[in-house]
Regions:
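Conserved SAM/SAH-binding loop
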Residues: 48-53
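Rossmann-fold NAD(P)-binding glycine/threonine-rich loop
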Residues: 90-113
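Beta-loop-alpha module in the N-terminal Rossmann-like domain of NAD(P)-dependent dehydrogenases
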Residues: 66-79, 94-95
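Hydrophobic/small residue at the entry helix of a nucleotide-binding pocket
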Residues: 12
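N-terminal Rossmann-like NAD(P) cofactor-binding module of classical short-chain dehydrogenase/reductase
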Residues: 62-67, 87-89
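NAD(P)-binding Rossmann-fold cofactor-contacting core
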Residues: 25-40
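C-terminal catalytic/substrate-binding lobe primarily of soluble NAD(P)-dependent oxidoreductases
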Residues: 132-252
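Conserved N-terminal Rossmann-fold NAD(P)-binding element of oxidoreductases
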Residues: 4-8
């Protein structure tokens, strides 16, 4: 029998399942297609197919890892809660998972959401600092997964679901200003920063505060995504001119 059930094994899911097996944990993976290297592990069992057709047959006693793209993970989330599974949720969804709090209570389950690097680890570090100093005033998070060198095109390759990257660029960003939550357009406050060992890069606002928004831990909070210079301006220019082909970007 396995220790965890992983729904999805894309860029992030494949990495996490591999790490769990390296630590000696047994994981059952469900996705439309399972990478060959995962199939070779003696600690990994798998089912290839539609997660919505297979989820009802899974044991309710196991922790489920929601590693699906945001649009799919958002739909599966309440179904998992109603089953009573405890859930570790990485799906970057537009809706707030807190909307399911009462449903989770009624089904005696726990949902840990946005548990990636940022949001996720960044939120934990901010909470740790808040506890250590008995309060903080200003918080700025700057995060980005980028290639080591820029190129002549986008200077980027998605480290997680490409559709979620586009969501990150188009979803309004929520920030905290003087203790109040404000909503601004994503990609605004574009500015240059210096990154150690890499030089000049660019940062812009995105909706990454998430669980920090209602925490009351800081008077001013913002999260910025970091990219190589020119990347986001290329996105903005193609979007504004109508030349942006999201389907082509997802295929690339």
């Amino acid at each position: 029998m396995y220790d965890f059930i992983a729904l999805g094994c894309g860029l992030i899911g494949k990495f996490l399942v591999t790490e769990l097996s390296n630590l000696g944990y047994k994981t059952h993976v469900i996705d439309l297609k399972i990478p060959a290297e995962l199939k070779e592990s003696s600690l990994i069992t798998f089912q290839e197919g539609d997660v919505f057709q297979l989820v009802d047959d899974l044991p309710k006693s196991k922790v489920i890892l929601n590693l699906l793209p945001g649009s799919i993970g958002e739909i599966i989330r309440p179904l998992l809660i109603c089953r009573g599974n405890d859930i570790v949720d990485l799906a970057f969804t537009e809706s707030e998972p807190t909307m399911h709090n009462q449903l989770a209570i009624e089904n005696n389950c726990t949902l840990l959401w946005d548990v990636g690097i940022a949001p996720g680890l960044s939120n934990m570090l901010i909470k740790k600092e808040y506890n250590r100093d008995s309060g903080i005033k200003d918080v700025t998070v700057k995060v980005g997964g980028n290639p080591a060198q820029p190129d002549d095109d986008w200077s980027y390759m998605a480290p997680f679901s490409p559709s979620d990257v586009i969501e990150e660029y188009t979803r309004p960003a929520r920030i905290i200003v003087n203790g109040e939550v404000k909503t601004v357009d994503a990609l605004t406050d574009l500015h240059s920063i210096t990154v150690s060992d890499f030089g000049t890069m660019e940062a812009f606002l995105t909706d990454g505060l998430r669980s920090l928004l209602g925490s009351g831990m800081g008077s001013n909070m913002r999260e910025y995504t970091v990219r190589w210079p020119g990347h986001i301006q290329k996105f903005i220019d193609e979007r504004n001119s109508g030349e942006l082909d999201e389907r082509k970007l997802l295929e690339e």
